[in-house]
């Protein structure tokens, strides 16, 4: 006869030896033995964890010897079931014997019993509220009549496995508060974002080696020409341009801020033995890759520092040339006049300055000529400065008036005549004389700020800068000093072939601010308006006419000699021919009290045509 229960239960098999007689079964002397066998299962190791038994005097286990006194099932927040079972006997002596018997039974009957020490064996056999339910406990009771009874109770066993229920609150707090190690970045945390592809190392994670890092730097535009560059790309030879910067990048990538080139150099020497890198003999900071990958991105090593240095050199040379020109063009003024004013324009291909923009003028006694080059030769835009200086003995106050003019191209159909007005407006009109002159209104507020109209004491000094109309790009020296040398011998000579026009008006009209020029007059050699000669004074002017000074260049012979000395090699015969011919122009200067015509032309020097 056999009885089989489920997998976690026990199998009780009674061996009868073939005796089926009721008399034989009822005889206590031949009562069959009880054989307890284990059914193989996953939880069989924990089957006898909480089994308790009581040894009776008649060596039989009765039901009354095993008593379950208390069972508690508590549901807490973690849905853990806590089962507390206390084994109680009739007296204290039986309790000790019961514990010893249970320990002996567990150590003997279990195939692989758990090791229990004395701390775990106490009156409360099962653990406290933090335990898990593992497997049911099977209580076997055999009465004197030979009828076995099976009773199952739930068992709770203390486990050491990591689980949310089994961990104590302190352990849970430790796990929650533990800081995770930040992942290693894929690229150095620097200004150049270098994307380096990670490679597996025997399937044990990702890492970037130093030689891979150097290859990544060589493929990055932000670092290749600046920190590291190829010297012989086909041979795999490269140079560390800035070894400190490369070592800092490698240190940031490895999270080592104290990385230097010596430490990185030891890693590079390790690659010599591996056959990855080689040191190029005779050259400092130059290495060679033994094997070059095929999918490299090559960057043209155009060193930006060279372009920066070249631009700095060009800028410094431009600044030096402008300083030299300024020193050459400095006007020598009278000893009593001090101070100065300078107008400086930035060199470069910038837009032409607007003639309406105000020019900064302080207390000028000398003005530095500045030239702004333009990309196209037409229209030629040149800035000139005109000084009207009064001698110190006539006026105690320092008086200097500066204005800038802009000349259009000589080949324009209609020459534009402009008067750029400063705070003290000096009307100066310059135009090519070989072309028609149209009507223009010249506003005049005050001619010279420091001159009293009622006083006519003292002669005037004029500094003029003119450009020949036939050569727009050839500029003569612009600082032409007109000085009064001898009262009886004026040095201004106007030949009949040159046409000059003088603005004639009365004093009141000029003071009111209106001056007009005849519309489109026909200029020729036979109809001059005002003619000067060496032996005669100013002629053909009615009373009340404002006397204006008309200035021309020097005579042809002297001008030719000056041009031949100072001209560049690129000035051909056309330039010399144009220099020989006197350049006619019309200039109008007016004052309320009139100017003396006894002035002399002083040509300082000629400017090189390509000086600006």
Curated annotation (Swiss-Prot):
The modification Phosphoserine is found at residues 110, 163, 167-168, 187, 431. Residues 172-182 have a biased composition (Basic residues). One of its GO terms (biological process) is positive regulation of transcription by RNA polymerase II. Keywords: Activator, DNA-binding, Nucleus, Phosphoprotein, Transcription, Transcription regulation. Predominantly found in hematopoietic cells. Detected in other cell types such as fibroblasts. Residues 156-169, 323-335 have a biased composition (Polar residues). One of its GO terms (molecular function) is RNA polymerase II cis-regulatory region sequence-specific DNA binding. It holds the Pfam family Ets. SUPFAM superfamilies: Winged helix' DNA-binding domain. It is found in: Nucleus. Residues 208-290 bind DNA. Residues 156-199, 300-361, 562-586 are annotated as: Disordered. The modification Phosphothreonine is found at residue 190. Belongs to the ETS family. Transcription factor that activates the LYN and BLK promoters. This is ETS-related transcription factor Elf-1. The lineage of its organism: Eukaryota, Metazoa, Chordata, Craniata, Vertebrata. The gene is Elf1.
